[in-house]
């Protein structure tokens, strides 16, 4: 027999103390969503099941005890730290869910200069860890635009990536070891070593699990020397995306690793670089690190771009100014809310990836299908995209779209605009051989394509869920679709 809402709250208070169990209605409503539903949120409308409680967890031991209780009574839990997620992964879609808030677990445990690694609890804000490292002359190398908001547990759980990934890698390249709590309360720790061949890499059961398999309580990441004085900036305008993709590929294949390598189409470039884009595509690079390496990297980039006569160099100071204003902190989020409420104009992104052989076709097919098939195309005020994370064998593509919300209630915006646009992007990307999600995580609004994304490998993911969360209490509806 399932517990009542009141009984759930009472037992949680017994486990962690009454002061850690939040039942204020406003807090509960805010914790039923993430930024995917920002339009109804701005209008004060919450249509999902409101959680029974938000539990402010203070230790791994508390996480273990709470999960053990929830597993025994089959209560759905939604792990949460910085709450900067954008794909619905934090939504509470099951009645009487409990939000497991780890933001109070906010201690930097160790900065180990000799072994070039740092250990932090799940609720440590990335910006706090980064600032502590920079004071000592080091960096995580991880710098997503959400850096002022995001916390370490969520960054690892969503398989996040930073703006300097072409040099430093994504979060999975940085994580050395972890501590996590399984659905039944079992605490598991993966030790910190540079590499091992002791079976499959079990870090990857935890990295990117989006709270659907376990709760991340502690992470250890690599650190690097921080040398911003050596940063070199390069910017170009050019006529077409195909040429831009070719340049990105050539730079990667030749072995150069700029920290930033970005290609914007004319539409997306215009909104970021009105002062020089002139209706053209934009290429941006930054070389950094050891001065000798940065210099050679910059020279190599300039040499490759020079082979394409259509590319015109722009003043590097313009690129540096752009670079210094990249991140989204609380002030920008607040300003965006005011602007949306005032204008009814929404902006979203959907990020995918593909090999060099298909990425341009993915870009063109998605843009064309949206323009010709989306029934509310007249409401779109901007449709474009950019590549911002490149690899030896391919790159990502951010599709960026703004639209005016017209003739619908705030709670209807998602199904009228956002979900149909997501659908086109996911379908075209998978059809052409790419991945429907590059670094935001599947969440609950791309989960419909999870099986199609993985194909015959879906059995492996299913096996993980059956093994580590047999009662299905971990973030229901994320990664794994709800079976009707």
Curated annotation (Swiss-Prot):
Keyword DNA repair found: no
EC top class named in words: oxidoreductase
SUPFAM superfamilies noted in UniProt: FAD-binding/transporter-associated domain-like, FAD-linked oxidases, C-terminal domain
Chain's gene name: ygcU
Disulphides: none
Any GO molecular function: D-lactate dehydrogenase activity
Protein's organism: Escherichia coli (strain K12)
Protein name, per record: Uncharacterized FAD-linked oxidoreductase YgcU
Pfam families, A to Z: FAD-oxidase_C, FAD_binding_4
PROSITE patterns to which the protein is assigned, alphabetical: FAD_PCMH (PS51387)
């Amino acid at each position: 027999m399932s517990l009542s809402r009141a009984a759930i709250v009472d037992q949680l208070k017994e486990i962690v103390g009454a002061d850690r169990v939040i039942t204020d209605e406003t807090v509960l409503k805010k914790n039923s969503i993430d930024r995917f539903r920002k339009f109804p949120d701005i209008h004060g409308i919450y249509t999902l099941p409101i959680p029974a409680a938000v539990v402010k967890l203070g230790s791994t031991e508390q996480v273990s005890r709470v999960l053990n209780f929830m597993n025994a009574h089959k209560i759905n839990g939604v792990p949460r730290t910085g709450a900067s997620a954008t794909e619905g992964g934090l939504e509470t879609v099951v009645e009487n869910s409990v939000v497991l808030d780890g933001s109070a677990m906010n201690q930097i445990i160790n900065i180990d200069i000799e072994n070039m690694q740092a250990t932090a609890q799940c609720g440590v804000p990335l910006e706090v860890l980064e600032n502590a490292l920079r004071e000592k002359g080091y960096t995580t190398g991880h710098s997503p635009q959400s850096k002022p908001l995001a916390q370490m547990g969520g960054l690892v759980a969503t398989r996040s990536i930073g703006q300097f990934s072409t040099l430093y890698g994504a979060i999975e390249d940085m994580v050395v070891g972890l501590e996590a709590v399984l659905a039944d309360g079992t605490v598991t720790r993966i030790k910190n070593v540079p590499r091992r061949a002791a079976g499959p890499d079990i870090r990857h059961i935890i990295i990117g699990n989006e709270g659907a398999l376990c709760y991340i309580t502690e992470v250890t990441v690599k650190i690097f020397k921080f040398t911003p004085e050596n940063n070199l900036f390069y910017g170009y305008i050019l006529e077409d995306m195909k040429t831009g993709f070719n340049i990105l590929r050539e730079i990667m294949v030749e072995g150069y690793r700029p920290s930033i390598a970005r290609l914007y189409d004319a539409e997306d470039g215009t909104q970021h670089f009105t002062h020089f884009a002139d209706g053209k595509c934009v290429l941006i690079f930054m070389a950094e690190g050891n001065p000798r390496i940065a210099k050679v990297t910059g020279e190599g980039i300039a040499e490759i771009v020079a082979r394409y006569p259509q590319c015109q160099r722009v003043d590097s100071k313009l690129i540096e100014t752009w670079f210094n204003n990249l991140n989204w902190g609380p002030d920008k989020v607040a300003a965006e809310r005011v602007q949306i409420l005032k204008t009814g104009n929404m902006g979203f992104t959907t990020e995918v990836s593909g090999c060099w052989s298909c990425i341009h076709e993915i870009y063109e097919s998605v843009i064309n299908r949206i323009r010709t098939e989306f029934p509310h195309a007249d409401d779109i005020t901007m449709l474009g995209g950019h590549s911002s994370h490149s690899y030896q064998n391919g790159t990502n593509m951010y599709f960026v779209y703004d639209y005016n919300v017209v003739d619908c209630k705030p709670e209807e915006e998602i199904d009228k605009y956002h979900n149909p646009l997501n659908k086109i992007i996911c379908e075209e990307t998978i059809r052409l051989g790419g991945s429907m999600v590059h670094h935001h995580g599947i969440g609950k609004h791309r989960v419909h394509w999870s099986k199609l994304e993985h194909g015959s490998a879906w059995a492996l993911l299913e096996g993980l869920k059956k093994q580590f969360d047999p009662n299905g209490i971990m973030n229901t509806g994320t990664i794994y679709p709800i079976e009707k």
